[in-house]
């Protein structure tokens, strides 16, 4: 077998071995990425101690604990939002 053909064969087989050793890539969840991007644009995180509570300058409902700033009750490091109607 000529050297060029041998080199091409090795270059074709080598990536297959690497992919098998590493395993398949994790599934991509577009919904979580969209929610995270939306929260970065519209929400303000109050405290590192309560990352699940977010206050927004707009009256928003749902979306992982996001509520309007005027109804978001914050004292110290804790914040609470009223339930959405």
Swiss-Prot record:
Keywords for the protein's UniProt record, in alphabetical order: Disulfide bond, Neurotoxin, Secreted, Signal, Toxin
Segment forming the signal sequence: 1-21
Top-level taxonomic group: Eukaryota
Molecular function terms from GO: toxin activity
UniProt subcellular location: Secreted
Ribosomal protein in keyword set: no
Tissue: Expressed by the venom duct.
Post-translational modification note: Contains 5 disulfide bonds.
GO cellular component, one term: extracellular region
Principal subcellular localisation of the protein: secreted
Propeptide residue interval(s): 22-40
Family per similarity comment: Belongs to the conotoxin D superfamily.
Function field: Probable neurotoxin.
Domain remark in the UniProt entry: The cysteine framework is XXVIII (C-C-C-CC-C-C-C-C-C).
Protein's name according to its UniProt entry: Conotoxin Lt28.4
Record organism: Conus litteratus (Lettered cone)
């Amino acid at each position: 077998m000529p050297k060029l053909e041998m080199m091409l064969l090795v270059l074709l087989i080598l990536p297959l071995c690497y992919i098998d050793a590493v395993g398949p890539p994790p599934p991509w969840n577009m919904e979580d990425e969209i929610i995270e991007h939306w929260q970065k644009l519209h929400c303000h995180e109050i405290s590192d101690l309560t990352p699940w509570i977010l206050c927004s300058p707009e009256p928003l409902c749902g979306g992982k604990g996001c509520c309007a700033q005027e109804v978001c009750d914050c004292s110290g490091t804790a914040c609470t939002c009223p339930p959405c109607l």
